[in-house]
Swiss-Prot record:
Disruption phenotype: Cells lacking this gene grow significantly slower than that of the wild-type under microoxic conditions, while they grow normally under aerobic conditions. Coproporphyrin-III is accumulated at a low but significant level in the mutant growing under microoxic conditions. Its main location: cytoplasm. S-adenosyl-L-methionine 2 binds at residues 72, 118-119, 177, 189, 214, 248. It is found in: Cytoplasm. It comes from Synechocystis sp. (strain ATCC 27184 / PCC 6803 / Kazusa). This is Oxygen-independent coproporphyrinogen III oxidase. The keyword S-adenosyl-L-methionine applies. The gene is hemN. S-adenosyl-L-methionine 1 binds at residues 60, 117, 150, 334. Its EC number is 1.3.98.3.
Length: 466
């Protein structure tokens, strides 16, 4: 059954009004608030609390290596053609796992394992097997665990795909970005159409449970017509999930982006048309619009979770997993434990040095206050469910003993008057509900509850909403 999504109109004035730098809210507070004054002992305390609660676990491992730079990339990467450079890194990750694993109650179910990058398939099969076994020996996976990996389709063959499936991965994701050759040239990611269809065919033959592909809009030389052609070809691939990300052009943070022709970037008006067409075209193809940038088939777990009001969000994006603790391994990885965020060192040197001293390789972190936890829940509900129940929030955090929802968020509710007048949300007797127009600008709605975004200069740290 096709799920339609109403077309919404934006005036130029409204577009300019809301096209501001805003976090993507994969966490609250955003990762930009992590600081080096963080007390590493809070990391241990958070693990202990999770042990006491028997909180399920998700694991993330960062593989930073890439054969060449993709100019659009905002991830932490190491560009090298020297494969042996990977071995010392894998040994260091193994050391981190050996430090963390004894602290974690083995009775806690590990429901997710994800490898991201970088390019995880930069690893040889022998290296991948070593890392996989190191992780699963220390953290036995639940029988129904989601075990996923990101790949660059330029660097795989049929044997590699089948070996990943045999190793234990049951989900796979790869980036297309755009089928258009001019766009691919501009971003230094050449992926012939025939190759992408061949890789998808191998993945289906290997019987992965779920396949996700990533697209990006806002890249150089893109326009409405060319991107709709990319959408058409993507639908022919028939992935289970499609992520369509708004390109974060932040050359002041990611200098490699300066290699792209800035003059060829589509304006905000064109990007909005692209996003609206994306929603229309993919829903016409039978996909369900999930969150702010994901699409899934109606029988996919993401779509089911959204229908049930059970969709969640963490540093990896939207997930079906309930409240779980996320342990991050490798450089730059972020752990998300109870009321604590902790990020590993960003450089190999600092990462290696810490582990050589048998010290947790934590560079910075953040301990959430009660107010942070409340606001995190509000933002998560808005980003995942597109509605907010004041009664449920009051019950969860005992707000009624001191003040109710309306008192606690009096300032924010007043600020929402403007967004309501612009048609982004509507008030309910028991809270808020986001409109179809508001879903496209959901980051703007969430930002009203972000106390860390008051400093205007911080907006320069984030990509624009449109």
């Amino acid at each position: 059954m096709t799920t339609t999504f109403p077309t919404v109109e934006f005036s130029a004035e409204l577009l300019n009004k809301y096209n501001q730098g805003i976090p993507r809210y994969t966490s609250y507070p955003p990762a930009t608030e992590l600081n080096k004054e963080f007390d590493p002992s809070d990391f241990q305390t958070a693990i202990n609390l999770g042990n006491y609660k028997k909180t399920p676990l998700s694991l993330y491992c960062h593989i930073p290596f890439c054969a060449k730079a993709c100019y659009f990339c905002g991830c932490n990467t190491i560009i090298t053609q020297h494969k042996p450079a990977v071995d010392p890194y894998l040994k260091a990750v193994a050391k981190q796992i050996a430090l963390v694993a004894p602290l974690v109650d083995q009775q806690r179910p590990v429901q997710q394992l994800h490898w991201g990058g970088g390019t995880p398939n930069y690893l040889t099969l022998e290296q991948a097997e070593f890392l996989f076994n190191t992780i699963t020996d220390a953290f036995p996976l639940a029988e129904n665990a989601e075990i996923s990996i990101e790949i660059n389709p330029c660097y795989v063959d049929k044997d590699y795909i089948f070996a990943l499936r045999q190793l234990g991965f049951n989900r796979i994701s790869f980036g297309i970005q755009d089928f258009n050759s001019q766009v691919q040239q501009a971003v230094n990611r050449i992926q012939p159409e025939a190759m992408l269809f061949q890789v998808m065919d191998w993945i289906r033959q290997a019987n992965f449970d779920s396949v996700n592909v990533d697209l990006i809009y806002g890249l150089p030389h893109q326009n409405l017509a060319t991107f709709r052609e990319t959408l058409r070809k993507t639908a022919q691939l028939n992935p289970d999930r499609i992520a369509v990300f708004n390109f974060a052009y932040v050359p002041w943070l990611k200098p490699v982006q300066k290699k792209m022709p800035e003059s060829a970037l589509p304006p905000a008006e064109e990007k909005l048309k692209i996003m609206q067409a994306t929603i229309a075209d993919l829903t016409e193809q039978g996909y369900v619009f999930i969150g702010m940038d994901h699409f899934a088939k109606p029988d996919d777990e993401l779509a089911i979770a959204q229908r049930r009001g059970e969709l969640h969000r963490n540093f990896q994006g939207y997930t079906t997993q309930p409240e779980s603790d996320l342990l991050g391994f490798g450089i730059t990885s972020i752990s998300m434990l109870q009321d604590v965020y902790a990020q590993n060192h960003k450089t190999l040197k600092a990462f290696y040095n810490a582990l050589d001293r048998e010290v947790m390789p934590i560079e910075k972190g953040f301990k959430l206050s009660q107010d942070d936890l409340i606001r995190r829940t509000v933002i998560k509900e808005l980003m995942c469910q597109f509605k907010l129940s004041a009664q449920e929030l009051e019950s969860k955090y005992n707000l009624g003993f001191d003040c109710d929802f309306n008192d606690y968020f009096a300032k924010e509710l007043s600020a929402l008057d403007v967004l309501e007048a612009d048609g982004l949300l509507r008030r309910l007797g028991d809270g808020l509900e986001v409109t179809p127009r508001g879903r496209i600008l959901i980051r703007n709605i969430a930002a009203v509850f972000d106390t860390y975004l008051q400093n205007k200069s911080k907006q320069q740290m984030f990509s624009r909403a449109i």
